[in-house]
Amino acid sequence: MKKQDLSVKNVVAMGIGSAIYVILTRFTSIPTPIPNTNIELVFPFLALFAAIYGAKVGFAVGFIGHTLSDFIMYGQTWWSWVLATGVLGLIIGLASKKLDLKNGIFGIKQILLFNIVQIFANIIAWIVVAPIGDIIIYSEPANKVFVQGISATLSNGITILVVGTLLLKAYAGTKIKKGSLRKED
């Protein structure tokens, strides 16, 4: 099996993506009535990076970006949710091979696939990883963390469905479709 190293492009994407993650978290979070749970417009951006660059970059941008934003904004990091954010980017990134964004293709089939995957990823991240991590690491009450997880799943799923789909459609629109260029006679 061939060892795959990270390319310079992917490392740069991780750094830029993490920095943008921090900025978006700082200035675009919308509070909800559920304690410590916000509507986060950063997650469609994470989905975009994961879909373009793949699972490693998706995980790293989510994990590093969330770590930095927690530390900068709160002075401490909530590791269970940081890991959940990384898992969200990882799962969306794993499915990116099925999307043909680099060839400018993001039609109904790809939109459906992307949204099925992102909903699944949100469920795993926010209803499994984050609450179980909260219970194990921080001894948080189960009823509280699962309500937070369900709220995060719904809000993040909807923001990625709407804004993430629009971002991916716009990105695919900037790419030249395979076979669209023809040699003139």
Swiss-Prot record:
Membrane topology of this protein: Multi-pass membrane protein
Localization: Cell membrane
Statement: the UniProt record of this protein carries the keyword Transport: no
Main location: membrane
UniProt KW keywords: Cell membrane, Membrane, Transmembrane, Transmembrane helix
One GO cellular component term: plasma membrane
Superkingdom of origin organism: Bacteria
Keyword Cell membrane: yes
Entry-linked InterPro entries: ECF_substrate-spec-like, UPF0397
Transmembrane segments: 11-31, 45-65, 72-92, 111-131, 145-165
NCBIfam families assigned: PRK13661.1 (NF010182)
HAMAP family: UPF0397 (MF_01572)
Family to which this protein belongs: Belongs to the UPF0397 family.
Name recorded for this polypeptide: UPF0397 protein lhv_0999
Record organism: Lactobacillus helveticus (strain DPC 4571)
Lineage: Bacteria, Bacillati, Bacillota, Bacilli, Lactobacillales
